[in-house]
Amino acid sequence: MSAILNNYQYIPNNSLNSNNSNNGNNSTILSLCDNATQLMDIIMREFNEPIFDYNQNSSEINKSLVKTIKSLLETLTKNLNNINNNINNNISNNNNNNNNNNNNNNNNNNNNNNINNNNNFNTPQIIINDNYKLYTPPPAPMLKGLSCEVPFETMEYMQPLDLSNNNISLNNSCNMINNDNNNNNNNNNNNNNNNNNNNNQQQQFYNAPSSNSTPSHSSPSSPTTSSIPFHPNFTLSQDNFNQQLQNNNNSNNNSNNNNNNNIINNNFLQNSQQTNQSLQFSTTQPNLNNFYDIPKQPIICSSPIVNIPPPFYLDGSIDPVENIDWKRTKISDFNFYGSLGSGSFGTAKLCRHRGSGLFFCSKTLRRETIVHEKHKEHVNNEINIMLNISHPYIVKTYSTFNTPTKIHFIMEYAGKKDLFHHLRANKCFTEQTTKLIVAEIVLAIEYLHAENIIYRDLKPENILIDEKGHIKLTDFGFSKKTVGGKNTSSVCGTFDYMAPEILNSSNGHGKPVDWWALGVVVYELVTGKLPFSNSKESLLNRKADFQLIFQNSYLSDEIKDFIFQLLSVDPSKRLGTFDSCSIRNHKWFSDINWLHLESKYQIDGPLSTLNSFINCDFNINLLKKSKSYTEQQQQQQQLPQQQQQQQQNNQLFNQTLQQQNFNFHPIQPQQQQQQQFFNFQFNNNNFNNNNNNNNNFNEACTSNTCGGTTASIF
């Protein structure tokens, strides 16, 4: 693809004059850039190769950087001299032509002024070979070890973009230039002066394609070509420039084609808008294989995401869940289906919101089972934590409803069961699949630690899988929000995943216990077994040095080293204790793009290709096995009618017996009591199930919604 770039966006227009450009002094050329960041960006665009090897030490990096900058300065100096010579020649020719054209002096002066303004380093034609788009990472820490510190966020990396459906090429760009020239000629009373046309063509060729647009980053709706994707390797072609200039001169002689040119110009503007929209929302279908691959770049850890915005889709629409008014929502607004699971305090059921038709998970806790003060504290902590966190890899809690007998959590529904189910179905995962799963877990734990929350219950049973194959952490009953990063001393969690410092509660424990549990999970995912058995020997091994045995010989040394560093008995030596960036920077994650992984809504998850995931029809089974709350209400309304019909039948039967004059013997008092007892049981059997299922809907309840809520249930 070929395109015309407006100018170097990173070089100020007033920083170069003809005198400085002809001297070729390195210090003068260096002053073109506002800072070292802009110069580094130009280097990245000029050379299609890494600037230096990030594994080298600082001295070698400085030498390589200086050498690269010198070569760039020489290239820029030559290009600037050629450009200024061509522009000065054009200016002199235009001045001579102006003396012979008295009727168009004003137009020629304007054109000369525009060309004089173009002495400020505007690029001529740039030949593009491939289709690429720019990807700018979000803010990140500075690169250390260089002679000048360069912000990492300014380094732009190229991602392939499929623009096969967009008919944007150099010919269209030239057509737009021709149309602008013809429009200018018509505005000047259709004066077909070739010299004036040359001036207009030169001015418009060096400036932006649209005469009214400025050489800056345009919005998606502006009709410029500044946002057309380009490849960092570009070449300056003076021959192509002269050829296009001659073609423009010939096309300007056709002054009668103004209407046709306007139509072509409008079509080009529409295509340009479509191109800008395609850059804002990628036209390529995301693929799991190439999504996690990135160009060679330094592995630099960005700060953890603290505030996650509502999920947006590719078309710009918001998640439908955000349209629900949770403050006015009641528990009776949901239809309840089958059970998703049960625990010591309650059960989880599938439910559906009537207004939106969206599925949710309702976690119901029975107050009668929560008697101990420690249990009450865990429930209060869970509610306060779940209502105040929001992350793509954590189950979202939207609202809670409190009744005199029950507590209801309305949470995000992950319809592909949990990680333990898929691990049992596949026995173990491949190393690549495990890497993608663990990377998502790392982001979730990193977010919790940034909020001063210790998870303390990481295990495959608490890692749910959503419809796209991504992980979702759930069950924050054992989580603890600390103040100022202080340690906690309570002993809780699942024994197989407990860190040694939890068992030795004298000094307390902190956030590193989650990284220990992660090491156990990684070992379990790739081997299908736990590293420690549930025995006294296992307890002793956690307190002393141990040696893990990997029976699978195909595992790489990187994953073994990753597990060993996570399962360090000393928390101060454990990977991720002082900074989660040490986990991201581990060599096992060298091919993971963390920036892309943090925005996961447009791609399929790591489990989406497994047979256990594809064949998991949890929603359909639950809907087939259970009845909705609406159907239960209809049955409850129909019961009085059935009773009335039964009473009518009894009356008819009694009337028939009276007509036949049967003689009945009176029953004994004992038989009468038995008959009443049987009738009582019969009536209870008809209504018992409905009364039990709908008891919570008839009770007065209060609700708490997400968004900075602090609630105390007990």
Curated annotation (Swiss-Prot):
UniProt-annotated catalytic positions: D457 (proton acceptor)
* Start-end of Low complexity biased regions: 174-200, 209-227, 240-266
Enzyme Commission designation: 2.7.11.1
The leader peptide range reads none
One of the GO biological process terms: signal transduction
Q: One GO cellular component term, please give it.
A: cAMP-dependent protein kinase complex
From the UniProt entry, list the residue stretches annotated as the region Disordered.
Answer: 88-122, 174-266
Question: Taxonomically, which superkingdom?
Answer: Eukaryota
One term of GO molecular function: ATP binding
Q: Where is the Protein kinase domain?
A: 334-589
Q: How would you classify this enzyme at the top EC level?
A: transferase
What this protein catalyses is: L-seryl-[protein] + ATP = O-phospho-L-seryl-[protein] + ADP + H(+); L-threonyl-[protein] + ATP = O-phospho-L-threonyl-[protein] + ADP + H(+)
Residue stretches in coiled coil? none
Chain positions found as Phosphothreonine: T488
Q: Per UniProt, which keywords does this protein have? A: ATP-binding, Kinase, Nucleotide-binding, Phosphoprotein, Serine/threonine-protein kinase, Transferase
For this protein, the record's InterPro entries field holds: Kinase-like_dom_sf (IPR011009), Prot_kinase_dom (IPR000719), Ser/Thr_kinase_AS (IPR008271), STKc_AGC (IPR045270)
Q: Which family does it belong to?
A: Belongs to the protein kinase superfamily. AGC Ser/Thr protein kinase family.
What is this protein identified as? Developmentally-regulated protein kinase 1
